[in-house]
Amino acid sequence: MTNKRKSAKPLEPAKRTPKLRTKKSRDLSASESSCDFVKVTRAGLHSRNKHQGRYDFAKLTQALPSLAPFVIKNPKGEASISFSDSTAVKMLNKALLSAHYQVANWDIPAGYLCPPIPGRADYIHRLAELLEGEVKGTFPHEKVQALDIGVGANAIYPIIAICDYRWRYTGSDVDPKSIESAQRIADSNPVLQGQLELKLQDQSQHIFQGIIGPTDYFHVTTCNPPFHASAQEAAFGTQRKLDNLAANRLKKGVTAKAGSQKISKNKPILNFGGQNSELWCQGGESSFLKRMANESERFAHQVLWFSTLVSKKDNVRPLRKQLEKLGVRSIRVVEMSQGQKVSRFVAWSFMDKLQRGEWIKLRG
């Protein structure tokens, strides 16, 4: 069974979703409001993450023999690849998906984001943990309906969630080429068939509107938002990462000159590549998050938990304050650290614990 690409249609004008708050709560300060706020910090990869420790290149090259020419020795004599080589990084991803997720047919068009899989997997596992906290006993993951905003050409979040938890996913994107690429991946891998539906968001000013229909319900949404405010800013950010990577290689005794690889603002290269819609939007990440929060209110009763990665730590507090103004009943900030790298996601629900329990009983 394969999925047809669907072009999103504008929703009919709908009545404003009633806020799940009382008049009294609107008069309370943020610290006194009825919003349940919890921040947690998780060190290291989730115990269910398949990518613990160093990559097993013997296993990976067995799964994908074409990775072998890209395997090198680092100064410690350990097997690795050059992470500044876009082809090597893509081959590593292909091998990881084949070896650990039974996704043997995966590819992305040139210039599109090639995501680091271990960190992406942790986002999914922490969200699964959030859902499991809603029930006593075993959570019915096979009944989960999830929505990925900005699925990209790589479809990485649906792949991980479908293969590890059998969630059913809807992926949306404003870029037709990304939708086409994700559809090819879904159609060419039996493990994904019938589990992933792709929708083109043809209203770029909207996030959920035009994607969530009147009869749609989702247990969770995921998103890796664009975090730059312009193409030029995105290009500078990419170059900075390349320079840092080259400097790190020099420190480890590998000959490479920082800044020796330059990019143009229109053509980011290497594993830090990406199309405009993947990298930047007007106003940057903070503006995108505010739009997402505001638009989520309209679908307060149709989504159990909204969530998004937040790249810049300084954007967490404004997002929290905005959500509290909207009458959100529960907010979770989950910080995930792997070595020196720290990432985080914010999840929110317009329902309290009791209401979420009833929602799950109705929809599984």
Curated annotation (Swiss-Prot):
Superkingdom of the organism of origin: Bacteria
Catalysed reaction, written as an equation: adenosine(1618) in 23S rRNA + S-adenosyl-L-methionine = N(6)-methyladenosine(1618) in 23S rRNA + S-adenosyl-L-homocysteine + H(+)
The keyword Amino-acid biosynthesis belongs to this UniProt entry's keyword annotation: no
Main location: cytoplasm
A GO molecular-function descriptor: 23S rRNA (adenine(1618)-N(6))-methyltransferase activity
Annotated stretches, region: Disordered: 1-28
Cellular compartment(s): Cytoplasm
Enzyme Commission code(s) on record: 2.1.1.181
Keyword entries, A-Z: Cytoplasm, Methyltransferase, rRNA processing, S-adenosyl-L-methionine, Transferase
Gene Ontology CC: cytoplasm
Entry's family note: Belongs to the methyltransferase superfamily. METTL16/RlmF family.
Name of protein: Ribosomal RNA large subunit methyltransferase F
Source organism phylogeny: Bacteria, Pseudomonadati, Pseudomonadota, Gammaproteobacteria, Vibrionales
